[in-house]
Amino acid sequence: MLYDDLAEIIANLRGLGGDHAFVEAKRAESKLPKSVRETLSAFANTSGGVLILGLDETQGFEATGVRDPAKMEADLAALCSENLEPPLRPLIGTHRFEGADLVVAEIPELPPGSKPSFNRGVGMTQGSFVRVADGDRRLSPYEVQLMMANRGQPRDDEQPVAGTTIANLDHALVDTFLSRLRRHRSRAFANLDTTAALRRAKVLVGTELSLAGLLALGEYPQEFFPQLMLTFVHYPTKSGPDPRNGTRFIDNVAAEGPIPVMVDEALIALRRNMKRRSTVRGAGRAETYEYPETALREAVVNALVHRDYSGTSHGTQVQVEMYPDRLLIRNPGGLYGSVREENLGVEGTSSARNATLLKILEDTPLPGSDRPICENRGSGIPAMLAAMRDAKLSPPRFADDISAFSATFPNHTLMGDDAVRWIASLDEHGLTDSQCHGLAMLFHGETLNNQAYRNANDLDSRVATEELGDLVARGLLVPAGGRRYAHYTLAEDAAPAPTDSTDSPAPPKRRADRREEILDALGDDEATRADLVAVTGLHDRTMTRWLTVLLRQGLIEATERNLRSPNVRYRRTSKRTLDETGG
């Protein structure tokens, strides 16, 4: 880790007043704290992180230092290698910071096939942790089981269901399924009778139905697994039931039957409860639902198809919850395999927890349609994001916490009138459409990081990084979390000012002009950009932007032509500002 990265991380910790999901600081003057094992396990099981030894959180992250950094490095490396299973290999180093030695370790996330990381001394169940916000939480036995299942290909959907026979199948679904198989996969299925074809497709295991076969083509799977269903609840308030009049819900549906029927019933319930919006199209008007149906269909299918079907989860249903400000779809079991929150939406990214179920549903259509339930091409979430973009809505927020996965759809137009007026009040010229979308997301109180920005705008990571960096340089955004774990918030003087009115938000306070601040910092001396950042506390990108402005105006000059050189220094010219000349 570079010194500048460490300084930025510590500045963020001090600004936040506490640790966060990707950074843990501990006072460790002479020995490793006992809780280090938990933190190392948590980082390795989540998204990786940075451990800083020698910072005292109780004293505002004061650099108290480490007395013998070489020994501390060796002790930490030995603990990672000998006390944790599998052994961890973090990047460990010492930095001199504010007169104290800090030992810094960068812990990478383990690949799915190696999780969970746990403390050997207490065993896998008691010694496995996960990072939640700024703390380390012990994994539940169910979460440990899911991580172990991710080490290979789960086979829960292939298991035979005791007491079932071919008579428990929906024969209309079976006829359509076999017809498609014989048409699309004639070499494998054309010459097989019904029983043989169902066995080859793994709908039948011997004389019993597989779990996948029962769920996809069964007449009533809930006869054997009552909770393998979908529930839909429409709540009257943002927090759920309305305590003022005792209304618990506006609508409540239990969707049962095979997966095609559950998807169909869920969409019927959603249509019944969604508001319609009128939009102008050409010379006429069109009625649209408040959420695009394509996005909802993909989300419901994903939840039913990619959920955990291990025995431990058979008592948990897929939940769809509608609130006035959002729609939440949640399923048991987090993301599987190589899929991560950061690559959701990347075309072709796919890992199938329930491979047999997916294969069957490729040739199982929705009721009254020729469209298959799923394509099994990793295209579901990209289609979901595209539908939300086309509808000018904010992208869904995805959350993976190992034991469950959820998609939350905000109920507002991304570039509504209030957001457009606020962005215009910033008086920033040359913003791209995607930058305006990113600002609008923060205006609506949503989380903004590189992934969310890409999802909202269909950009690659490089372009997203450049555009977010430009917003930082303009003084509109403030990065937090360090480079690797960066997320963004609105700068204080760019945020909409609070207002007592329930109408439009007041325009932001006028953002500071940094020219005088930088000129004062220069004085009669020369300084590098890094020197000026240290003196003023401005972000490096913001400093770069204002130095460019001052150079263009002739108020400063550079000592070298190559402004990219870290050695270039700046000094004031004889030209004076309007304030200084009294103009």
Please identify what each model-predicted range represents.
Residues 1-51, 55-104, 111-113, 240:
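Polybasic/polar functional segments that serve as interface/processing modules
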Residues 87-165, 315-316, 375-386, 390-405, ...:
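Intrinsically disordered, low-complexity regulatory tails
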Residues 129-331, 336-338, 342-347, 371, ...:
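Active-site helix-to-loop segments that bind/position phosphate- or nucleotide-bearing substrates
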Residues 291, 459-470, 538-549:
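Short amphipathic alpha-helical interaction segments
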Residues 327-372, 415-431, 499-505:
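Glycine-rich/acidic phosphate-handling loop/turn and adjacent ATP-lid/helix
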Residues 394, 472-482, 551-562:
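A short, conserved structural fragment
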Residues 444-456, 524-535:
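Short acidic, hydrophobic short linear motifs in intrinsically disordered regions
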Residues 482-514, 559-583:
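Short, cationic-aromatic polyanion-contact patches
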